């Protein structure tokens, strides 16, 4: 079952340390990354183009921008460690890249939680072909 979950998370395009980011999302939202954030809107999942459809999609847009701001790091493969204190995610010390990747993932997971009330099922498994507007700059 754990292997299936790992494969599902990988297929949705979650970057960074798949296990840690997926766990953060579950802890913050009570929802599994798959299927809720697999291909939500124009930015959740692999790639991203167009204008974010809502605040949840904007979380993914900002997450993509965060990863893009660290060209010397490998957010798709670097593994980081974190723990929780009083309910808050604390990124542990590691390399500078690991810490920055963790902070990007933390911000996205918290953003997902903060926008649970406005999550729209109509944007879950949203076709890329509908993301036609000009992309915003980070």
Swiss-Prot record:
Xref: SMART domains: PA2c
Recorded GO CC terms: extracellular region
Keyword Hydrolase set for record: yes
Disulfide linkage: 42-131, 44-60, 59-111, 65-138, 66-104, 73-97, 91-102
SUPFAM superfamilies xrefs: Phospholipase A2, PLA2
Catalytic activities: a 1,2-diacyl-sn-glycero-3-phosphocholine + H2O = a 1-acyl-sn-glycero-3-phosphocholine + a fatty acid + H(+)
A GO molecular function held by the record: calcium-dependent phospholipase A2 activity
GO biological process, one term: negative regulation of T cell proliferation
Xref: InterPro entries: PLipase_A2 (IPR001211), PLipase_A2_Asp_AS (IPR033112), PLipase_A2_dom (IPR016090), PLipase_A2_dom_sf (IPR036444), PLipase_A2_His_AS (IPR033113)
Binding annotation for Ca(2+): 43, 45, 47, 64
Keywords of this entry: Calcium, Disulfide bond, Hydrolase, Lipid degradation, Lipid metabolism, Metal-binding, Secreted, Signal
Major location category of this protein: secreted
Tissue: Expressed by the venom gland.
PROSITE patterns per UniProt: PA2_ASP, PA2_HIS
Catalytic residue positions: 63, 105
Record EC number: 3.1.1.4
Superkingdom assignment: Eukaryota
Cofactor note: Binds 1 Ca(2+) ion.
Signal sequence annotation: 1-16
Keyword Metal-binding found: yes
Cofactor (UniProt): Ca(2+)
Compartmental location: Secreted
UniProt-listed PANTHER family: PHOSPHOLIPASE A2 FAMILY MEMBER, PHOSPHOLIPASE A2, MEMBRANE ASSOCIATED
Role, per record: PLA2 catalyzes the calcium-dependent hydrolysis of the 2-acyl groups in 3-sn-phosphoglycerides.
UniProt similarity note: Belongs to the phospholipase A2 family. Group II subfamily. D49 sub-subfamily.
Protein name (record): Acidic phospholipase A2 5
Organism annotation: Echis ocellatus
Lineage: Eukaryota, Metazoa, Chordata, Craniata, Vertebrata
């Amino acid at each position: 079952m754990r292997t299936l979950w790992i494969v599902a998370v990988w297929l949705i395009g979650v970057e960074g340390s798949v296990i840690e980011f997926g766990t953060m999302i579950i802890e913050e939202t009570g929802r599994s990354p798959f299927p809720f954030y697999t291909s939500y809107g124009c930015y959740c999942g692999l790639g991203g183009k167009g204008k974010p459809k809502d605040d949840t999609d904007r979380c993914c847009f900002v997450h993509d921008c965060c990863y893009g701001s660290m060209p010397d790091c490998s957010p798709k493969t670097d593994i980081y460690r974190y723990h929780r204190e009083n309910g808050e995610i604390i990124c542990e010390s590691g390399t500078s890249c690991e810490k920055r990747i963790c902070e990007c993932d933390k911000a996205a997971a918290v953003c997902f939680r903060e926008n649970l009330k406005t999550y729209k099922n109509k944007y879950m498994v949203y076709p890329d072909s509908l993301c036609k507007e000009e992309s915003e700059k980070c």
